[in-house]
Amino acid sequence: MKTVIKNGTVYQNGRLIHADVLIEDQKIKVIGTNLTGDKEFDATGKLVAPGLVDVHVHYREPGQTYKEDIRTGSEAAARGGFTTVGAMPNVTPVPNTPELMEKMVKKNQEKGIVHIFQYGPITNDETTDIIPDYAALKKAGAFALSNDGHGVQTAQTMYLAMQKAKANNLIIATHAQDDSLFNHGIVNEGKKAEELNLPPVTELAETTQIARDLLLAQKTGVHYHICHVSTKTSVELVRMAKARGINVTCEVAPHHILLTDDDIPKDNGYYKMNPPLRNKEDQAALLVGLLDGTIDLIATDHAPHAKKEKQGGMKGAAFGITGSETAFSTLYTKFVKKDKVFTLEQLLSWLSDKPAEAFGLKDAGVLEPGKNADIAIFDIEHEATIEEKDYKSKGVNTPFTGQKVYGETVMTMVNGKVVYQRGTK
């Protein structure tokens, strides 16, 4: 059967064009005008984009399915326009053997409604210094390695991990955090931490580990990816490293460019995340880093929790906020439509082709004939309100609920199949 998406504004090869998209046999066949098919979707006034790519999500299965599971997490991704995601390995048990990795990959395929690529751990349970068999994990389906949620605390362990990752052509994606400097902190060091009388988080907890790892990456030649950079100094370190030819990429999370610690209204668990919200100077540096190419891509760090784990003050709350369902609309509304900091083409690139390119996901993030028909359609002309009742995720832990936005997802397709359509259950 031939399906045509008609009359849309199509993002292709870095440009926006007025075109139709013809889909057949799960693939994009033609992008052109005056196309016809057996089934047609009218996308007049809508944005037709490649399915977005999010290389940083937490789906909590197995082990904590009361927070999220593969099905609900992937449904949330689809509702946000994401068709390809990278799932972090901080589940129970951690997929640190080929048997566990194979089981995880199979579960992702059976339960997920989007393409789910699975990370393996850098170290066995993400906190020890024991390095698993990377070759076996890769053979079993691991596409990259991460201890996200934990920094690798010893330089020797990271050095060995990088050597082994390089030998197996695997990316090391790190949560840069020196625990001795993090020191059970909650809010970014500064006025807000003092005002709320909460333990501060120094930027050094992030930046010292990035500096260490960049030297190790230079020595080993590994592809070193930094998750959720959040400080001005982090951006400066990456900029210098790229100038020296170090094989480094990095991501920024939407909340770190949309919000600062000044936006925390009170001691509210919904604003507790790791890294924490930083100051305005850091926020400005992150935006400059995106615009000049120092920061390669945007990734949500979708981290769902049960309501009871985020209610009340920050001290007792879990770290993390959701992001899959709010990322595109909040970023588009603030930075493209209102403040005009980015172009729409730039935003789409950071959410589609750039992450796919960074992680070598060859079929993802582009609209081209012959590629998988992974497509997201957004309504960028009409305002909508982000409402808790609409979330597909089990987690509702986001400060963006109630915001009025443009860019709501109308439809998401994976391999030509509609996996989300606005207004349907």
Swiss-Prot record:
EC code(s) of this entry: 3.5.2.3
Binding site for substrate: H58, Y59, R60, N90, N274, H305, F319, G320
Record key words, sorted: Hydrolase, Metal-binding, Pyrimidine biosynthesis, Zinc
Enzyme class: hydrolase
InterPro entries: Amidohydro-rel, DHOase, DHOase/Allantoinase_Hydrolase, Dihydroorotase_CS, Metal-dep_hydrolase_composite, Metal_Hydrolase
A GO biological process held by the record: purine nucleobase catabolic process
PROSITE patterns from the UniProt entry: DIHYDROOROTASE_2
Pathway it works in: Pyrimidine metabolism; UMP biosynthesis via de novo pathway; (S)-dihydroorotate from bicarbonate: step 3/3
Residues binding Zn(2+) 1: H56, H58, D148, D301
Catalytic activity: (S)-dihydroorotate + H2O = N-carbamoyl-L-aspartate + H(+)
GO CC, any one term: cytoplasm
Annotated family: Belongs to the metallo-dependent hydrolases superfamily. DHOase family. Class I DHOase subfamily.
UniProt keyword Hydrolase, yes or no: yes
Cofactor note: Binds 2 Zn(2+) ions per subunit.
PANTHER family: ALLANTOINASE
Organism of origin: Lactobacillus acidophilus (strain ATCC 700396 / NCK56 / N2 / NCFM)
Any GO MF annotation of the entry: zinc ion binding
Gene3D superfamilies: Metal-dependent hydrolases
Protein task: Catalyzes the reversible cyclization of carbamoyl aspartate to dihydroorotate.
Active-site positions on this chain: D301
The organism's taxonomic lineage, starting at the top: Bacteria, Bacillati, Bacillota, Bacilli, Lactobacillales
Ion transport found in the keyword field: no
Protein name: Dihydroorotase
Cofactor (UniProt): Zn(2+)
Binding annotation for Zn(2+) 2: D148, H175, H228
Pfam assignment, any one: Amidohydro_1
